[in-house]
Amino acid sequence: MATTGEKAIYEDQNNVNIIENVVDVANGINESPKTLFEEDGSSRDSGVSMTSCSDKSDASPEEDVDFSKLESGRVALTDCSNFVSILQRNSSVSSSRSSSFYNYDTPTGRKMKTVFDLDSLDHSEYEKRVMSERPTDNHRKRTSSSMSPSVTLLDRKRSRNLSLVAPQSDKSCRYNGLNNPRDDPFGDEDDEVFEQSNVRNSQVQNTSIFAQPAPRTATSLWDLAPPMFFERKTSDTSGNGSFQERPKQILRAMSVGEIDSELPPTLEVKYTLPGVDNPQRESQAFRSISPTTLLLEFQRLGDDFDKKYIIVDCRFPFEYKGGHVKGAINLFRHDKIKPIFFPENGEASSFQNRVPIFYCEYSQKRGPTMAHAVRSIDRVLNELRYPHVEYPEMYLLDYGYKSLWSTAECRQICEPCSYIPMTHSSFSMEFKSARLERHHSMASLKPNGETSHREEKKKRCTRSVIRRNNSSLNMLSRSSSALTSTGSKTSSMENILYGLDDERRPKWVSAFDIQSTESENDLDAALIYQRNISSNASNASSIVNLAEERIVQLGLQVITPDFPDRPSESSSTTPAGEHLPLGEGGHQIPCGILDFSSISDDAE
């Protein structure tokens, strides 16, 4: 128990102060506490100074102090020193952390962390003067990195504690990557350039509650780089109020296109027949009607039905012959669309001003495809008159001929009154042939409805056959001339091959020119004609005369008849080049002998 005049020292760690209470138990005296240690607001590192605040004059003499009673006081002072050191170290770490978040000396707005506290560095006289004259409200705004809950709570506690320890620092920061212009040490302080910059920078309000870091003590290389202007904008969609940094020079490209106020007109079709509620195939090119609607239209118009409507059966020919709607035409090839619906040379089509009605067996594939093909060709041919078309109103028989045949009352408009399915076993070959023909017609169809693929292919094949026939006849003539020639010409195989390898077109004249397909009667007539000419001539020159030569058209295949035996050498009675009469020997096979001995490559 403490006696009179004894001093009990208690440690108040919450207020970071050491309080001395003088208690006089006997006399009931409790003196007001005296602070042994107080905060030094003018301290350079904003820490807690351990300066004694008990007046030296009030201190009791050394001889009046019981040192044994002050042991607890020394322990308390040691604990207080340790606590203040920890607090000062935490303050330094927190200050370095906040300075790393609030330095915008780099284009990215971040600076490398340092282990030194900038507040503990000494500054020159010029920097101190600049710091004292700089406006106190020129502070930066907070960034999104410092808005995390843990960092914010930690900084608020530190700020509350530091508000009791030291006032806010007057050091300002650089805002948005711009270097705040300092007072010109070599010129007039009233320069308009520096004044305007100071006024502009002083308008930035401080939203931070932390002690600001000290300015740099040396010139960085980033000061020499051109300034980057950043614009901070609070995100409207962000829940935590984060900021977005965007350079002012990089503007977002915005579209300046304008939508045309007047859109092109659309095709408005006034259908006269009612459609079905739930059609099997929906399309903007046609409307689906039921078999009952078609029957009622037949009964209403009677014989005038063909004058208003044209029914198009898109099935294969064997299906069409097995049963179709009265007055329907069979059209399953797409290359026949243009000649029927869009005739050329100004001829008026028999289908113009008539409404087409398409159908197939089920109206799922062939019928709708044919209707779309007609509309597509119509669009191409009337491209300059859009949206005009020649056949705006078109219909499709819903569920096709199968549905019409299934309705007993509608069978009266079928002709003949029967129905053959597409997959009927008796017409498998006709089905395969018609399907292949339909596919070829679709492949050769052009957007404008023309089909020249097959015709061009036929022309190429004809020219190829003519070239092969001419080449064969040329080779036959050269071989015969080489084998029957004497004197300077040799019959060796080398000379024959050498002549065949010559790519030049020879100047020889053949007795027959193969060009196209004809019958054998033309061959007989040509042979008789050549025999009559040769009887009036003394030599075979008339055979090779171009003016008197008769061009004979033979077939693609040359049939070599069985010639009768003839002497090895031509007799003097038989003129060279004269043909033997047909039918010699009692048979009707055309035969003849051609003597090519007088014909050479140099004949003119």
From Swiss-Prot:
The keyword Cell division applies. Residues 33-67, 127-188, 443-464, 562-588 are annotated as: Disordered. The keyword Aminoacyl-tRNA synthetase does not apply. SMART domains: RHOD. Residues 127-138 have a biased composition (Basic and acidic residues). Its EC number is 3.1.3.48. InterPro entries: MPI_Phosphatase (IPR000751), Rhodanese-like_dom (IPR001763), Rhodanese-like_dom_sf (IPR036873). GO terms for cellular component: cytoplasm; nucleus. GO terms for biological process: cell division; G2/M transition of mitotic cell cycle; meiotic cell cycle; meiotic spindle organization; positive regulation of G2/M transition of mitotic cell cycle; positive regulation of G2/MI transition of meiotic cell cycle; positive regulation of mitotic cell cycle. CDD domains: Cdc25. Keywords: Cell cycle, Cell division, Hydrolase, Mitosis, Protein phosphatase. Residues 44-54 have a biased composition (Polar residues). GO terms for molecular function: phosphoprotein phosphatase activity; protein tyrosine phosphatase activity. It catalyses: O-phospho-L-tyrosyl-[protein] + H2O = L-tyrosyl-[protein] + phosphate. Residues 305-413 form the Rhodanese domain. Gene3D superfamilies: Rhodanese-like domain. Belongs to the MPI phosphatase family. This is M-phase inducer phosphatase cdc-25.1. It comes from Caenorhabditis elegans. The gene is cdc-25.1.
